[in-house]
């Protein structure tokens, strides 16, 4: 299917070159499925552009990180013990880092990110030393890999990390990155110095109990802003009312805010912000639209089944759903009307794979 991609790209470039004005290039959706497939989907035609086999996946694809030039997809695979880089067009493996060794079993629990210049991967590692008679749990760490290291990449440096981290997000200036866990941590990417800690579980919001969030999906496109639903209880007199808030983190400015928007916990998984930043969309057993100007629930519809992951088109007109089963769903962003369902070839399960949006080149 790589050949068909190249022919389509050649045709598209020829048409673009002869047209009077440039037309927006279509969104491409990137997702992974069991046991070892990476799919590139043309959102404009609701069709699979390419299907790549991922070497060494060993059953499942978890987190997907896209390089800044959008040419390489970095995939967490093999029971969270290996990271591979796949050329999006050709399907060729261009990077591999085996995290574990015979002496140490290392897991990356979803959390990894890439530097804005595309030169380094930052990976959250949970190591366990394999002794002859016992397993010794070691301290978590951040490991940094050079993306040009080929198929035998080793960490070029590492530094101590907190426990219970599940999302890493690089800041656009390349100097630091965020780690989301019990709290929001910021680290210097070169020295590993902790630059600051802000509250998530330790937030200081009057009349709110300790919050909870499940932020496994590091989606920040197209705005550069990370959002996640946060569940808590708000004390009203003698009662406590279950409430959902939206966590909003601007990666460029560093601004962090929480906004209550509904008095129940129907939304617990991923959210994404619209390009105009006036709406957020969330998914679980329902599809939810949130007004992010007034921070109120706009509308909600039931879904055919649970979806774990959500993204939005670059023009803000469509919502993309995935992360479970073998279907990717397309919904109208304004009305939440279902527009199409794409069943992936072989109907293999996406499980917890990240749903990413890139652009045709």
Predicted regions span which residues?
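Bacterial N-terminal signal peptides
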Residues: 1-14
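Predominantly soluble domains enriched in secretory-pathway, periplasmic, or organellar proteins
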Residues: 13, 17-361
């Amino acid at each position: 299917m790589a050949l068909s991609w190249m022919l389509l790209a050649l045709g598209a470039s020829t048409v673009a070159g002869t047209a009077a004005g440039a037309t927006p290039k279509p969104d491409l959706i990137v997702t992974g499925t069991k046991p070892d497939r990476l799919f590139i989907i043309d959102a404009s035609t609701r069709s699979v552009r390419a299907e790549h086999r991922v070497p060494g996946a060993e059953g499942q694809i978890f987190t997907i990180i896209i390089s800044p030039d959008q040419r390489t997809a970095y995939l967490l695979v093999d029971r969270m013990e290996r990271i591979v880089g796949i050329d999006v067009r050709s399907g060729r493996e261009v990077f591999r880092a085996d995290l574990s060794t015979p002496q140490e079993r290392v897991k990356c629990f979803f959390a990894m990110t890439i530097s804005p210049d595309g030169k380094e991967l930052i990976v959250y590692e949970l190591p366990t030393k394999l002794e002859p008679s016992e397993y010794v749990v070691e301290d978590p760490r951040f490991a940094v890999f050079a993306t040009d290291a080929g198929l035998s990449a080793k960490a070029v440096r590492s530094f101590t990390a907190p426990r219970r981290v599940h999302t890493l997000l690089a800041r656009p200036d390349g100097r630091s990155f965020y780690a989301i866990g019990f709290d929001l941590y910021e680290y210097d990417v070169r020295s590993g110095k902790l630059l600051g800690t802000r509250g998530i579980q330790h937030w200081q919001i009057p009349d709110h109990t300790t919050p909870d969030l499940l932020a496994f999906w590091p989606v920040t496109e197209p705005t550069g802003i990370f959002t996640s639903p946060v569940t808590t209880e708000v004390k009203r007199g003698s009662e406590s009312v279950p409430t959902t808030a939206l966590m909003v983190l601007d990666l460029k400015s560093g601004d962090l805010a929480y906004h209550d928007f509904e008095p129940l916990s129907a939304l617990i998984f991923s959210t994404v912000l619209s390009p105009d930043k006036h709406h957020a969309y969330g998914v679980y057993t329902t599809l939810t639209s949130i007004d992010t100007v007034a921070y109120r629930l706009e509308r909600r519809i039931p879904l055919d089944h649970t979806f774990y992951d959500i993204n939005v088109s670059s023009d803000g007109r469509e919502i993309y759903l995935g992360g479970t089963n073998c279907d990717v769903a397309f919904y109208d962003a304004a009305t939440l009307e279902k527009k199409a369902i794409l069943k992936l070839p072989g109907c293999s399960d996406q499980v917890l794979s990240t749903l990413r949006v890139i652009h045709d080149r």
